[in-house]
Amino acid sequence: LVLESWCCGGSPLANTHRNPLAVDKPRCAFAVRVAFALVAIPALCNVEVVAAQTGTALRGWALVETLREGGYNIYFRHVATNWSQADRVAEAGDWTSCDPDRMRQLADAGRQTASAIGDAMRALQIPVAHVFASPYCRTVETARLMQMGKIETTTDIMNMRVAEYFGGPSALIERARERLSTLPPAGTNIVLVAHGNVFRDATGVYPKEAEAIVCRPTGKGSYSVVARIPPQAWERLVAEWRSPTRALSPPQPR
């Protein structure tokens, strides 16, 4: 089962490692309206998860249930940064600098977002076994503010702009794919915090700042991209998960 997720009418996610069936947008739009009627959370745009093989729309808490079961790699692009700053890498290791005159750093709004995402993941009780981050200051700080566990830095998910220091683009892309295809310990998930360009080059999907992309690994060198979660969706997922009407709804198909 390949899942695709979007919010507020965003574009469905194209899976670059499988060939899922096309999503029936009108049918999904109708299902969204039904979900709103069942889960009465005023003015909330529900995070929808779509089973691409059947076209069946699932409410956002079905995604939460899936993540609570574990078995996924949750890839975050670092949160919002200050784009008036620029990366100035003259030699290996410069990327670890937290000096805004040398490297682009997080914006204050981004820091608040990282903390809020971490709060939401804990509220949803999504189990995390490991947290890996690119050694860039902005990715490590994002992971630290999320407070999901001990952070281990890895150059396997490095910014493509410094690929020359790590064997070139092809080598870096291959290592990123290996990370995405690695199975987490049973019943848990792995969080990776890195950059948009390496994920784009490895999968064809380009995450926005603070966006989470959920990958289901096989442990056999392959994986599938199953959901995209924009940063503003986490609060909505928590609201829906806590809704008393959730317990009254029938089990959702996987």
Segments predicted by a language model, with ranges:
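Residue-identity detector for glycine
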Residues: 9-10
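Bacterial N-terminal signal peptides that target proteins for export
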Residues: 17-36
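Bacterial N-terminal signal peptides
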Residues: 33-46
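Boundary at the C-terminal end of the N-terminal hydrophobic targeting segment
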Residues: 45, 50-54
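Active-site-proximal alpha-helix that buttresses catalytic centers in soluble enzyme cores
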Residues: 53-155, 160-164, 205-254
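A short, acidic, amphipathic alpha-helical segment used as a generic capping/interface helix at domain edges
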Residues: 173-184
